[in-house]
Each structure stands twice: as structure tokens, then as C-alpha cells.
Amino acid sequence: MTGAGSSRTFARWFRRRKAANAGGPKVALFATCSVDYNYPQVGVAAVQVLEKNGKSVEVPRVVCCGLPALDGGDLETAIGKIERNVAVLLPLVQSGTPVVVLAPSCGLMMKSEWPQLVPTDECRAVAAATMDVGEYLAKEKAAGRLDTNFTVPQGKVAYHIPCHLRAQNVGQPFRAILQSVPGTTVEAIEQCSAFDGTWGMKTEYYETSRKCAGKLCSAITVSNADKLASDCMLAGLNIVEETGCAPSHPIELMRDAYGLRQE
């Protein structure tokens, strides 16, 4: 999982490719701004994994979830983005399509903050249909609908469990999935990256953020893992800054475990 801009956006890649599994169970993929503009390969991996499991993936024309605006105290902008997204997502939700999110911070915003800021039945319905991608795949696995024919071992994986995923109370879904890959062990690291939305980006808090991420980065260093994973792209910025190692999103490791080539 690398970042710092990309020559292609995820949305552009998706709309130029041939759709798969027409008529299969639909999934609305809320890619997030980070994936669309900086980490398109995470979105590509998610599409590959979902399509491997027979899903018909749709990427609706949504806008930012509103978290950066809310983080900066701009409620008017945040509410405007929420209302716009609800209008796009509601018809999908009403047809029984789950909304699957690729970044924990955005998923937490959609599940928890959206219905508080826009307390309508429509917004509550969209929030209730929203799931983290790992949460969704774990439910598919529990229902016997997940392809578990993994063929490529991933070795020892140091897996950072982001705070905003833990706040969703969905457990550690990707940990269980990756541990089912032959030749793979997962060491979960539950330490804060101290990025905290946009807080860690600000000049006045940058050094404090780096210092607070010390426990996480030390745990990663001493793990001596073959691979490093985190669901949170923002956490990855502090991780790579302090350790020199860029984490993959767990969905990328899952794609690799299937033996699928990177598109």
C-alpha cells in the first residue's frame, strides 16, 4: 500500500474496465477519497476479491464522507456531503445492496456520525447498511459464501488493528480471514498510530503524533514479520515515516493469497 498520489484514480480505472458477475449479488463499494486518489491499488484489490467471490461490484458516484470537514468544525460542508451521499446510496440500499467501505475512519463516520448529523430515516437506513470491507467478508465467510481456496502463503503478517476499526465493534475480521490462509500467521498489534484524522497532518501536532506512534512502530519493528498490514491508509503514513515499511491493506494480502495478479 503506497501513497502520495497516483497517475490514475480508482474511479477512472473502474469505469474503464469490463464489469464482471452481471446478475450476481450486488455490492456498493465506497472507495473513499484516500483510495480513489492516493491508493487506487487498494480499490483494485477489493474489486478483485469481491469479484472472485461472485459479487457484482458497483462504485457509486459519491463524494467525500465529510470527515475532514467535520474534523475542521465545518458542519455545513459536512452535512451537505452527507446529504448528497445519502441521495446516491439510498436507492442501492433500498434494493438490498450493502455499502462496503475501504477505510475505517470513513466507515465509522458513516455508521456513527452521519445519522447524528442528518437524523432522517433515509440517512439511518444507509448507515445501517454500511460495513467495513473486512466486516462484510467475515460475514460472507460465516455464511459459507467466501471462497477460502487460498493458494499462496503470506508468511508472518504483522497486522495493525486501527482505532477506528476497533471503535466499530466488529472484532478483527481480516485477522481471522488471513489466519485461514495456509502458511500464514498473524500477529495483531493494537496500538494507536496517533494520526487521528487530520490531526497528525497539522504542523503544530506533527511531532507529537510521531512520538505517540512510537509504541506501534516499536511493536512492528520487533515483530520481524514478513509482511505488514493495516486497514488504515492514514495510519500507514506514520508507520512508513517511522519504520520505513509501507503497510499493505489486508485486502491486498487476501488478493495475493488467492494467487490473483495485480491489475
What are these language model-derived features?
Residues 1-263:
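Iron-sulfur cluster-binding electron-transfer modules in prokaryotic oxidoreductases
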